[in-house]
UniProtKB/Swiss-Prot annotation:
Gene3D superfamilies: S15/NS1, RNA-binding. PANTHER family: RIBOSOMAL PROTEIN S15, BACTERIAL AND ORGANELLAR (PTHR23321), SMALL RIBOSOMAL SUBUNIT PROTEIN US15M (PTHR23321:SF26). The lineage of its organism: Eukaryota, Viridiplantae, Streptophyta, Embryophyta, Tracheophyta. It comes from the Eukaryota. Keywords: Chloroplast, Plastid, Ribonucleoprotein, Ribosomal protein. Its main location: plastid. HAMAP family: Ribosomal_uS15_B (MF_01343_B). Part of the 30S ribosomal subunit. Belongs to the universal ribosomal protein uS15 family. One of its GO terms (molecular function) is structural constituent of ribosome. The gene is rps15. This is Small ribosomal subunit protein uS15c. It comes from Illicium oligandrum (Star anise). GO terms for cellular component: chloroplast; ribonucleoprotein complex; ribosome. It holds the Pfam family Ribosomal_S15.
């Protein structure tokens, strides 16, 4: 398994309960699970876990987008993730 360096976007004094910290930790988990699933395609339990984490991250990003658009844009660019489609 290829391990990539984890993203350290949030400073240490930032609270672990903050939206930015949660989104960055979910992004780390998503990247780890994605590399795992490239090797183990039939690991359906991990696929389900990945979908759950993706949904949680999407909901947190939607919340942050509504509350503070500037912080949302900064976080999206720092984590190098795409902006979700809006319906």
């Amino acid at each position: 398994m290829v391990k990539k360096s984890f993203i350290l976007v949030i400073p240490q004094e930032e609270k672990k309960g903050s939206v930015e910290f949660q989104v960055s930790s979910f992004t780390n988990k998503i990247r780890r699970l994605t590399s795992h699933l490239e090797l183990h395609r039939k690991d359906y339990l991990s696929q389900r876990g990945l979908r759950r984490i993706l949904g949680k991250r999407q909901r947190l990003l939607a919340y942050l987008s509504k509350k503070n658009r500037v912080r949302y844009k900064e976080l999206i660019s720092q984590l190098d993730i795409r902006e979700p489609k809006t319906h």
